[in-house]
């Protein structure tokens, strides 16, 4: 995987989280065309950039607990 592909995955993940439309980790993996394990690595990438992320079990989506603006 190239660095550009890595950044694109993070950016797409951010958009799904921002709009609260991620679905489950399995669904998200399919939407991003990556493995479930990579979903968790990309979530960690965002968290390492300062994002506070939680999973809402009722709505079945990841969301930001505080406003977050991704700047790459």
Place the predicted regions along the sequence by residue.
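Key DNA-contact positions within bacterial/archaeal DNA-binding proteins
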Residues: 37
């Amino acid at each position: 995987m190239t660095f550009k592909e890595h950044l694109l995955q993070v950016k797409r993940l951010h958009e799904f989280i921002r709009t609260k439309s991620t679905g489950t980790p399995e669904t998200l993996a399919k939407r991003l065309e990556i493995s479930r394990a990579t979903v968790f690595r990309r979530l960690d990438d965002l968290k390492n950039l300062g994002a506070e992320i939680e999973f809402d079990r009722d709505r079945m989506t990841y969301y930001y607990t505080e406003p977050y603006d991704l700047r790459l």
